[in-house]
Regions:
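Nucleotide-state-sensitive switch-loop elements of NTP-binding domains
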Residues: 1-28
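Phosphate/oxyanion-binding active-site loops and adjacent basic polyanion-contact surfaces
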Residues: 2, 24-28, 57-62, 171
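Inter-motif core of Ras-like GTPase G domains
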Residues: 11-18, 32-56
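Well-ordered, non-membrane alpha-helical segments in soluble/globular domains
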Residues: 34-35, 59-67, 90-103
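Conserved C-terminal guanine-recognition region of P-loop GTPase G domains, centered on the G4
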Residues: 38-42, 54-88
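G-domain G4 guanine-recognition motif of GTPases
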Residues: 52-55, 78-97, 114-132
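Beta-strand-loop-alpha "switch" segments that mediate conformational coupling across diverse proteins
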Residues: 99-158
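C-terminal accessory extensions appended to soluble enzyme cores
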Residues: 154-185
């Protein structure tokens, strides 16, 4: 749905027990305009999850989004910030320094930041033509399969699949920690 279809968004919120509204960066301004026109509509939303990336301009945009929503009456404790596409080898406070320089945003983040680290899993899946669910649910014993493979090509294919599975396992573990740190009720 487009942000302009705000009445339909409200209906869908009311039609379900739990709704996640993903407002892309290209729709955020229109979404905020509509939310302001439909006064009190922010009360239909339990949490506002704000993904923040490393680029300074986007960090400034995220601060502005939070500021605008707070001016509409959204309480500070209803915000959840996700530091997205973070690098594991650089401290979070350096990667997101613009965002964390804002006192309100820093307070929202708290002591246990929610972090989703950059990972090449989706590029690898795309290049190899593999589906996320297929790899995720593949519980074969790759070690045994590789040892019993009848050709070098089969061993390489199985070894590549195992490497993708291992990368996905690491990514999923990071997501589990991030979800836990969201502290959703």
């Amino acid at each position: 749905l487009s942000a302009k279809e705000f009445d339909e968004i409200i209906k869908r919120i009311d039609d379900s027990e739990c709704t996640i509204i993903d407002v892309g960066s290209s729709n955020i301004e229109q979404f905020l305009v509509q939310m302001n026109e439909y006064q009190g509509s922010h009360d239909l939303i339990d949490y506002f999850i704000v993904p923040v990336v490393r680029e300074a301009k986007q960090q400034i945009d995220s601060i502005q989004t939070i500021t605008t929503l707070m001016a509409m009456g959204v309480e500070q404790d209803r915000f959840k910030v996700i530091f997205n596409l973070a690098e594991k080898d650089t401290p979070i406070n350096k990667q997101y320094s613009v965002f964390l320089a804002d006192d309100v945003c820093k307070e929202i983040v708290g002591e246990n930041p929610v972090v989703v680290y950059h990972n090449n899993i989706f590029n690898i899946l795309n290049k190899s033509g593999l589906q996320y669910d297929d790899v995720y649910n593949d519980n074969r014993d790759f070690r045994s399969l590789i040892r019993s493979a009848s050709s070098k090509e089969e061993r390489q294919d199985l070894s590549n699949l195992r490497a993708v599975k291992m990368l996905m396992n690491g990514f999923n573990s990071d997501l589990d920690v991030a979800f836990k740190n969201l502290n959703l009720v």
